[in-house]
Amino acid sequence: MTGQFKWRLGMPAAALLALGTLTGMPSGVKGQVATPSLAPSFQRVTPGATTPDRDGFLRRWLLLEPIDKPNRSNSGFTATYVRQALTAPYFPGQFTALPRDGQVVRAAQPLRWHALDSTNFDVKLFDFAKALGKPTYGVIFWAVTIVDSPREMRDVRMTVGSNSASIWWLNGKETVGLFNDRRMVMDDVLSDRVTLRKGRNVIRGAVINGPGLSDFCVRFVDANGRPITEVKTDVR
């Protein structure tokens, strides 16, 4: 018997119930399905908005369980193919609705949105899918977050790195595209100069991947290339 389980034997039933919920163990409540643990790459969001990390990377996201899109390699991820694949309709409200944590959308199969805080500057999509027992290869991931700016910010740039190809929209407008087979590199592609509105700004992203790992990172930089950290992010 390992030490991990020795100390559980004498725990009260209520404590065991709570522990099961946190770790993805069966809760013991009839009809209740515990959410698998997404540690160490993610944590469940806590109430209230959060801020980017000290380097400006946005870590709070709503992630949709992966959409099946078979690709045996990433070599065919041309701009034309990626744009067709990522702008095709997969679920209602794809480009317009603000999803909610736990919301299920009807794609080819039901898929659930998860509100998460990444523990790394790069959001590890492969780990997300694997932890949920979902496909990790030949898939499309959708990500949404809300950036709340204390004032209008002009001449900023969105910077993105992704593995593999991806497209990103700011307030409904395509802002960054990363095409071809690529590794995730921070600040891999910078947008043209854009404006963050005072108040809420909606970011949507779609990442396509064949075989291999998949992740992304997003931040905003000012006209001098300095990371913007005075905004807040949330998923509601």
Which role fits each region the language model picked out?
Residues 2-15:
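Bacterial N-terminal signal peptides that target proteins for export
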Residues 28-125, 205-236:
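Accessory carbohydrate-binding/adhesion or oligomerization-edge regions at the termini
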Residues 149, 158-162, 207-209:
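Non-cytosolic beta-sheet module surface loops
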Residues 154-169, 203:
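Aromatic-lined ligand-binding clefts that engage carbohydrates, nucleic acids, or primary amines
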Residues 167-219:
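Beta-strand-rich ligand-recognition modules
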